[in-house]
Amino acid sequence: QKNYEDAYKPWSYLFNNAPKRTKNIYLHGPKIIKGLIKNTSDQARKTTLVDSLIMVYDQRNAYYPGKEAYVLGMKGADMYKYMKTTTVGLQASCQVLRGSFEMAGNESTASVLNYYFMATTKLVQAKVLKVEDLIALFSDLSGVISYKEAKLTQDIYNAEQTEGLSSKEQKLLKKNKKELKTLGD
């Protein structure tokens, strides 16, 4: 059972008082906070929780470096999900997603590519960015998408030709199929 309210207090204590104790603080924290955001109707609390969620990603990169582009991508995607109703929120999410994309390049996740494009599109619609910016981004993303589709298709094919995949290999195959589907959406 997902009782986010009960999980939040001990998680928050560790996050604030022992931030380097375990990486699990940063792996499970976003799930707990997103569960609380989903289950609250109090707008002020939602805003505070979104701020906390963003802080989790920042602190994860500070205390557990090595996956900065990936973590920035998750941060940017969540910023888009929760802050897309304001131009300032869109600009902030777009900036974070751009940073993730620039760091990761061909290794960007499909969700980063999708959210980056959606945020840019909304900023063009709001007349904050120009259509030319969207066209340039489309060109940049198209190359990465083509590369990822080819690589994922090959990885999936190779895995499906292998007999007796380990559970880890089966999880990777499932993840690759999901990523390929997301690229196509």
Predicted regions and their residues:
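Preference for long, solvent-exposed alpha-helical segments and helix-linker "stalks"
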Residues: Q1-D185
